Structures are given as C-alpha cells and as structure tokens.
Amino acid sequence: MNAVAHGETDILQLLLEILAKTCSAYCVIGGLAVSAYAEPVVSLDVDVIVTADKVDAVTAAARAQALKVEQLEHRVNLTSEKSDLRIQLQTDPRYQEFLSRAVQKEVLGYPLRVASVTDVLQGKVWAYLDKSRRRSKRQKDLADIMRLVEAHPTLEAQLPPSIGQKLNE
C-alpha cells in the first residue's frame, strides 16, 4: 500500500500506531473494507470509525505525528505531505454501532479491524443514497455494492429496492 501511495511514510501503519497509543476502538469502512470481503481494489482513501469519545485524542496524536488535520461536518481528514494516502475519520453517529460488530481481517497486508460485511454494505448504501455527494463518488459506491453482492449473493436481499433494480439493469 505504501508503494502505491507514493509514501515516504507508511501512513496506514502510523494510523494503527496512533490508534493503539490512544487505546481507540476502531474499524475500517468504505472501499478498503469492501476489499476485505470482495476482490481487493486499491484506493487512496481509508475510511475509519473510532469511538466518538476518542476522536479528539486521535486527532491530537495525529498532529503530534505531523499529520495535517482538517475537521469537516461528518469527518476528520488526516493527511501527510509524505504520502498520497488520505485517512478519513468518519464522525457521523450512525456508524458508531458498527464498532461492536467489527472483525479482525488482513487487508492488503495489514491486520485491521473491519466492519462486518453487512455493516460495510449499509455504509455503502448510505453513501450511495446521499444526493449531496458527487455523482462519480456515488457511482463508485454502487460499484462497491455490486462487488459485495457478487461475493456474497445473500446480501442482495438487504438492499433497498431502488438499488436492487440498478444492480439488475
């Protein structure tokens, strides 16, 4: 992953160290989580949930490690000049319940806590249905939903009808 991200610094490993140092429960969601359950696809975005009461500790530790911290409405972006990889701490409260169902998986060579497959699907459905997101992002979310359903066909029954129809077009 570090080579793909043109990284002088392994920012994902740095994040794992920050999470351990701050004793933060976490799980990966988004495209990287999809890769844990379907054919892996490399992405330069890593979407992570941490317990709500640890967000400040994680961002403080990230700043101490010279990461740039940008706080937005429902996420905190962590970036480094030494890597193209972007870490997004999702702060939308809907995701907090995913933490209790997360499982340990190896993803692209990293041992990670990953949201359950049904939670990953739910997160992708929320993202796809969010009309405020760019169309290109929503199309990627739909492709990720398709990847999950292809790898786990029983998930199709959990999709809203509008998305199920799109998958069968």
Residues covered by each model-derived region:
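Compositionally biased terminal segments of proteins
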Residues: 1-169
